Amino acid sequence: MSRLLPLLGSRTARSLRPGPAAAPRLPSWCCCGRGLLALGVPGGPRLLGTHPKKEPMEALNTAQGARDFIYSLHSTERSCLLKELHRFESIAIAQEKLEALPPTPGQLRYVFFHNAIPFVGFGFLDNAIMIVAGTQIELSIGIILGISTMAAAALGNLVSDLAGLGLAGYVEALASRLGLSIPDLTPKQVDMWQTRVSTHLGKAVGVTIGCILGMFPLIFFGGSEEDEKLETTN
């Protein structure tokens, strides 16, 4: 029920938006106009139930917000709302029983790029930070403590993982600014094997490209240090 209440709220808000000189018109499909008017019109009067007039109500996508809205309705309004929710749920169940077509090649390509682009950033940052941190650890702490190159690389990987925890949100936000919205697929199409294969393939290709691009710090680290180590050992 909490899943359907936001849909009802958004539908009510659109249908109850007042014109320049006209009063808000109540929808013909429901008789509980007074309770929905208090919910749907932004800044409208909330004179029902125990909520004060200036107290903001929580969103209906939370259990507390849905409970407060239900308690603010009268018995006839609650029965009308329950009847409409049952009708909406029956329509949704009927649509789920229909056989869904597999995703088109265009949709699969969109799913591929939608999953590949963020993982390019993840792979790039992970590899670049690991190389830089591992090299600095080897040249500073490694000389003092005498740790091996593999131990320095492991510590660099630790730094890269810790940095990835904080940078993951920024990478996702940057990828969302590119205009890649969520693929328009039905729930059945999302669960199909074609979509899953395209999703995992996009992630794998994105990480591979990102890790290859993340090797660019090796350009700035010359081989003179390794040559000096070889000369000293010889």
UniProtKB/Swiss-Prot annotation:
InterPro entries membership: TMEM65 (IPR019537)
Extracellular side, ranges: 132-138, 225-234
Subcellular location: Cell membrane; Mitochondrion inner membrane
Gene Ontology BP term (one): cardiac conduction
Transit peptide, UniProt annotation: 1-55
Keywords, sorted A to Z: Cell membrane, Membrane, Mitochondrion, Mitochondrion inner membrane, Transit peptide, Transmembrane, Transmembrane helix
Annotated knockout phenotype: Knockdown leads to irregular staining patterns of perinexal proteins, altered calcium and potassium currents, impaired cardiac conduction, and intercalated disks structural defects in both cellular and histological levels. Hearts ultimately develop dilated cardiomyopathy, severe fibrosis and congestive heart failure.
Tissue spec: Predominantly expressed in the ventricular tissue (at protein level).
Membrane topology term: Multi-pass membrane protein
GO CC terms of this entry: intercalated disc; mitochondrial inner membrane; mitochondrion; nucleolus; plasma membrane
Positions of transmembrane segments: 111-131, 139-159, 204-224
Superkingdom: Eukaryota
Cytoplasmic side: 56-110, 160-203
Role summary: Essential for maintaining proper cardiac intercalated disk (ICD) structure and function as well as cardiac conduction velocity in the heart. Its association with SCN1B is required for stabilizing the perinexus in the ICD and for localization of GJA1 and SCN5A to the ICD. May regulate the function of the gap junction protein GJA1 and may contribute to the stability and proper localization of GJA1 to cardiac intercalated disk thereby regulating gap junction communication. Regulates mitochondrial respiration and mitochondrial DNA copy number maintenance.
SUBUNIT field: Monomer. Homodimer. Interacts with GJA1. Interacts weakly with DSP. Interacts with SCN1B.
Alphabetized PANTHER family for the sequence: TRANSMEMBRANE PROTEIN 65
Protein name: Transmembrane protein 65
